[in-house]
Each structure stands twice: as C-alpha cells, then as structure tokens.
Amino acid sequence: MDVEKFVENAIKEIRERVKDGKAIIALSGGVDSSVCTVLAHKALGDRLIPVFVDTGLMREGEPEKIKEIFGNMGLVFIDAKEEFFKALKGVTDPEEKRKVIGELFVRIFERVAEEHNAEYLIQGTIYPDIIESQGGIKSHHNVGGFPTSYKFKDVIEPLRELYKDEVREVARYLGLPKEISERMPFPGPGLAVRIVGEVTPEKVEIVRKANKIVEEELADYDKWQCFAALIGKATGVKGDVRVWGYIIAVRAVESRDGMTADPIKIDYDRLRRIALRITGEIDKVSRVVYDITPKPPATIEYE
C-alpha cells in the first residue's frame, strides 16, 4: 500500500464531502478512530468536533488516556454510562446488544452535532467490519448495528477499504504514539460483547478487572489480541465454602488482519498464575479457562 497516497486521498475525500461544513468524529481511542481523527483534523481543522462517549464499557483508565492524548483537539467528552446501562438492561441477544449500542451512539452523536451545528459524521469503519456485518457473522455497531434512519447529511468512512495492519501503517506514518498505533484491537461496543448474556455494572467491573490482569500477565507475549470474557457461572470452593461464581475465559490470539486467528501457546505456569490472580483478586469469579479455538470456526470476540 502507498501510505502517502492513501493519506493524501483520504484528506481530499473528507474535504470534498464536508465542503465548508462541520463534522463530528466518533473517537474511541483505538487505532482506527484515532487515525481517522488525525486525517479529519488535517482536512477540516477546527471544523472537526471529536467526540468521545464514555459508555461505562471501556477498559480501565481508558477515558482518562483519551482526554490526555486528544484534549488539544477540542475533544467533547460525554458521560453516557447511565444511558448505556439503562438501554442494555434485560438485553441478552448479542445482535440486539450491538444494535442497541449502535443506535444509542448515533443518537448521542446527533445531539452533539445539533449543539455544534455539524451535519456530517466521520467514523473509523474498516473493511473487516463491513465483511462480518454483511456476511451475517456479527453486526458491528458502526455497520450492521448502525440505525437506518439518522439526521446526518452524510456519513464518511475514510478507512472502509483498509485492513487493520494497513491502518497501523497509516498510524505510524502520521506519527501517532506507539500506544495508539500498536494498540490491541478493542470492540466498538466495548466490554458489553465480552459478557455473554445481560450486561450489568457488576459484570462489567468484573470483566474489566480480569481484562487488566490478562493484559498485564501477557504483556511480554507477541500477540494480536488478548483479553478476558465473562461467559457464565459455575460452582467453586473458596475458603471451604461452596460458591456459585462467574467463569472467566482467557483469549489470546495471533493474526495478521483479524480475518483468521490462532490461539497462542502460553506457558502453563503463566496460565496458572493468571487463573490464581483472577480468582484471588476478584471475589465473584470461581473458574478460569483458556480458549484454544482458532478463527474459524470461532470468532475472536465472544459476541
């Protein structure tokens, strides 16, 4: 890929489609939305309004990190935790979850756009998002989960033809910090799709803590992605007392573009340490398993 040519064309496309108007951009802090934000900022300057929505479904410390990196671009920070938990109450179907989240994201963006007199939405959709949504594998919140009715004049997706490894190339070319350019993929719906079943504040806090432990313990492994997911409940024993606790699945894979993936081989002692830390540091977890399923037949994320 000719990265320089891509950047030049992406900036040109954004300018041509937004013209003299204003645009808001959905910023999550991931490499896709971060690259999109830098490209759009180069194209529009202060006519771009970056919006970060704190859904309550982010990893530990993520909202604070976003403020630190993008605060100088006029970042609009929206605390929508209560809205998201209310909207997800009672929802157990993964497709419905993604649609609920996609719908709420867009309605929040519409509110911000109205306040700033912006008519365009820019988002960091990449090619695998489109393939999986169109193929019926899973609806990505910014594609299949995107509502059919919205108030924007146009939705612009400059990265729609790129794979993740190509987006990383662009990030490096643009000089984004390594913590962004090499950041592990994180789903747009956040920790909601790392919880099988209904999403509750308690489950989110558990999976957030478990995710942090997994990332810490596997920091020295070469991987595409690693994370923890809450997948159900099982009987356990803590302090000679029976407990009915949560099951945490650990997932760690290698991949080039996310379309296929293989589980990485983790040293047994490391896996045991992860299990002991998660069950020891998180009261309501009774069991930890390591998922060794490749993609296909599994997807990388659980929902």
Swiss-Prot record:
Residues 1-183 form the GMPS ATP-PPase domain. It catalyses: XMP + L-glutamine + ATP + H2O = GMP + L-glutamate + AMP + diphosphate + 2 H(+). Keywords: ATP-binding, GMP biosynthesis, Ligase, Nucleotide-binding, Purine biosynthesis. InterPro entries: GMP_synth_C, GMP_synthase_B, GMPS_ATP_PPase_dom, NAD/GMP_synthase, Rossmann-like_a/b/a_fold. One of its GO terms (cellular component) is cytosol. GO terms for molecular function: ATP binding; GMP synthase activity. It holds the Pfam family GMP_synt_C. Pathway: Purine metabolism; GMP biosynthesis; GMP from XMP (L-Gln route): step 1/1. Its EC number is 6.3.5.2. ATP binds at residues 28-34. HAMAP family: GMP_synthase_B. Heterodimer composed of a glutamine amidotransferase subunit (A) and a GMP-binding subunit (B). Catalyzes the synthesis of GMP from XMP. This is GMP synthase [glutamine-hydrolyzing] subunit B. It comes from Archaeoglobus fulgidus (strain ATCC 49558 / DSM 4304 / JCM 9628 / NBRC 100126 / VC-16). The lineage of its organism: Archaea, Methanobacteriati, Methanobacteriota, Archaeoglobi, Archaeoglobales. The gene is guaAB.
